[in-house]
Design a protein with these regions (language model features):
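A short, active-site helix/loop in glycosyltransferases that binds the activated sugar's phosphate group
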Residues: 28-29, 38-61, 192
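A short, well-ordered alpha-helix in the C-terminal region of glycosyltransferases
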Residues: 210, 217, 224-238, 250
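Conserved acidic donor-binding segment of nucleotide-sugar-dependent glycosyltransferases
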Residues: 196-197, 201-208, 217-223
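C-terminal alpha-helical cap of glycosyltransferases
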Residues: 238-256
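Nucleotide-sugar-dependent
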Residues: 141, 155-173, 184-192
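Acidic anion/phosphate-binding donor-loop and adjacent secondary structure
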Residues: 49-53, 63, 68-83, 97, ...
């Protein structure tokens, strides 16, 4: 793709503009080995530290900055944690079959956003706890309206050997903007911050029993959810899109 091509040219001084890249889709090793960048931004602390160790000579050209939401797009609301409603509003790499089973066993109202082609195969219309919100055409405003009726964001991904790329980032941004505690799979990039800053709960990816336990915990501990909601709102304010833009601006200014 273009960024690898330009990076390769830059390595041999055949690309004159300053070249900065935001790395979000791993693997990164080959790009750092064969290409040259004037600066690299990582969205995940795990990969940032790993690449600094693997390529110490380039570490001074690497930065860490969490991608955040545009807070002006979202309303400020009070969420209901006494009768929590879960939602998974992503489509890429989502293990919604697992979520259907876990929500049913935990007996917690759960909304799964899906188009006609990707409705979970184990979902049935008579399920008392899981509902499918069909959205064949993306509509951000309607999505925010739906999110405001829910209280907990779930990001259930399929198992993988390494941490996934930016899978779930949009859902996580929605959650940080609205103050929704998260239940995320252990192989997501945001799992680290969810644990570190108490933004929600992390379940072992692919583990039905663990996901069921985490959902049940949310139902039984509304006060803990309120605390997590305050934490994730604070995290969103401290890591919004304006901060990300300022990091990029400061790096660009340093080139001149």
């Amino acid at each position: 793709c273009e960024q690898r091509y330009f990076g390769f040219l830059n390595r041999f001084h055949m690309f004159k503009p300053y070249y900065m890249l935001v790395f979000h889709h791993p693997p990164f090793e080959k790009r750092l080995k064969y290409c040259k960048y004037d600066h690299i931004i990582f969205e995940c602390e795990y990969y940032y530290k790993k690449m600094c160790r693997m390529f110490p000579k380039q570490a001074d050209k690497m930065s860490l900055c969490v991608w955040g939401p545009d807070l002006s797009f979202y309303p400020q609301i009070d969420l209901n944690f006494d009768e929590p409603i879960l939602i998974s509003n992503g489509r890429t790499n989502r293990d919604h079959n697992l979520l259907v089973d876990a929500a049913t066993y935990a007996k917690v109202h759960t909304v799964i956003v899906s188009d006609e082609k990707h409705i979970p195969s184990n979902f049935t219309d008579d399920n008392q706890y899981v509902e499918i919100y069909k959205q064949n055409v993306l509509n951000d405003k309607k999505m925010v309206e739906l999110l405001c009726k829910c209280s907990i964001m779930v990001i259930p991904t399929f198992p993988s050997e390494e941490l996934l790329g930016p899978i779930g980032n949009t859902s996580f941004c929605d959650a940080t903007a609205l103050g929704m505690p998260c239940i995320v799979a252990s192989n997501t990039l945001m799992a680290e911050n969810v644990m570190k800053f108490r933004l929600g709960l992390v379940y072992n990816v692919g583990d039905l029993n663990d996901l069921t336990e985490k959902i049940t915990y949310c139902r039984e501990h509304p006060d803990t959810l309120k605390e997590m909601s305050r934490n994730i709102k604070k995290f969103g304010r401290e890591n919004d899109s304006l901060k990300f833009a300022m990091v990029i601006k400061n790096i660009v200014d340093s080139f001149y």
